[in-house]
Amino acid sequence: MIVQKEKLLISLKNQGYSDEIIKAFAKIDREFFVPDQVKIYSYDDIALPLDDGSTISQPSTIAFTLSLLEPKQGQSILEIGSGSGYVLALISEIVKNGKIYGLEINQNLAIKSKKLLEKNLNIEILNRSGLEGLPEQAPFDRILISASCPDRGIPYSLLSQLRDPGIIIAPVGTSLLKIRKINKIVSEEEFPGFSFVPFVLKS
């Protein structure tokens, strides 16, 4: 898979992504986060199914999402719907000594991802709904919602947990929304043309 991974890294580099993002993709092996039957496709730029019926997003979509999120070294970051843990691992490489929290409502996914990432001391994964965020660890510099929200409204509970300045990335329908908070003013930018699994409210 070395050749396939190198092709993916070249493709991401040609798309103009930052050195930090490229280095994270180089360091983290996607095949460890997907089922055995699809490992051969680990470095194809496609979404892959997980055993529970959800998916792991295609690498180019993840790279674009991370570019919007703008993670920085030392930041505190929350991912809601952390799934396989692949994106958490990528973010961990970028924020270094920062702290990353993942909320995953699916118990099996939460258990598997905890085991995969147990050596990443800056990652904490909790098996719980992400609807209310993680107020006991707030505020966060960045919040990433990794499942499609049911409407355009981002819960106030999440906005209130965002540091000022800070950024939330949230999939809504077939678009990615970038919500930025600066000096108590919240602005929104939309990036259409994507597909995401729906947000699950209950396990």
What are these regions (language model features)?
Residues 1-78, 86-90, 109-112, 117, ...:
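Class I SAM-dependent transferase core
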Residues 66, 71-186:
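Conserved nucleotide-cofactor-binding alpha/beta core module
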Residues 142, 202-203:
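Positively charged
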